[in-house]
Amino acid sequence: MKIERFTMALLIFIAGSFVLLYSSSNLHGPDLRRRLLCHAVGIDVEKGEFHITAQIFKPSQPGSDTPVDITQTNVEVLDGRGKTIPQAIADCERQRGKKLFLGHLKLICLGRNVDLSKPRDLFGFCLGDKTVCLETDICFCTDSAQELLQTHMTTEMISTENYINLLDYNAKTSRCARCRLIDLLGEKDENYTALVPVLEVESKGENGKEPVVRAEKTAVVQNGKPVRTLDAQRNSEAFLLLKSSVSAVGQAQVSAGPETVMIEKCGLEKSMTIKDGKLCFKCRLKVAADSLGESGGEKAEQIGKRIEEKLQAAFRESYSGDLAQDIFGLEKQLRFDLPRVYLNYKDNIQQYLSKAKADIEVVCMVK
């Protein structure tokens, strides 16, 4: 009897194992051979229609393990059009008879005419797909997203990797901001301010030369549209207050003229307070400058003062007039530090922030 029970239990265990193995194989996701692996999506608006540009991986042979190489035919760009973004994506899919798989999506490029006032509607195709990473990068293009995604760069395995590396490096070195999908999906209305990097095709790489793409501008988006542009040459100090920044280029005045030095961000403290009955943004930034020579202390003081003046100027330019351009994220800081004050003014928050004052201190040390 015990042997029969043991045999029965063993058979049930084996049968259950087969069921689990079969089920787990189906839980691993869709069969990628039946999907178009999409690395980047471009969104343009032309004559009331959405124009989608999808950069996809295309193996040279069905089911092959072809390595991704933008110089070969295994990377392809598809174009689709429609009254809505899902319709435009469906147009891309009809051209190959396969569904777009967005689990590998790394970049969403926006043409200059795209309206960001309702980000949840615009990126609804991502919200409905659980495979999309919320850390996907967002960028604007100087002209059309199609032009950018059709510019094939060959220094990385896929063109998209070049764009991501460029955005990552320039954001860390205070040459542009960085914007992720989750940053925009968290906004519920059109009154938010967002900093979106701009990718610019400077050269398409004719005559066998590598294309040149730059990420040295950042669009300040308000009410869904870019209202001005921050430039790496003029506004790099402002990017030091962003969490993506880790270093920047500073200048010190010496007898021979301006001297350029690399500075590293060592610490940043930000808070919102009420001072003398007025809203005040307090900021303490610590940076370290490298290779300042014998008069390092004097140069460091000059660098700190210069950065401080630049930040004050950027604050005055952004937080004045009728509505604030919240480039330093004061609304979120206010919501965290002074929640009751935020609730009192949340319906007219940009107008309230435009009356804020700044208390900014920059300390530059010698490495």
What kind of feature is each model-predicted range?
Residues K2-K367:
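Membrane-proximal alpha-helical signals and transmembrane carboxylates
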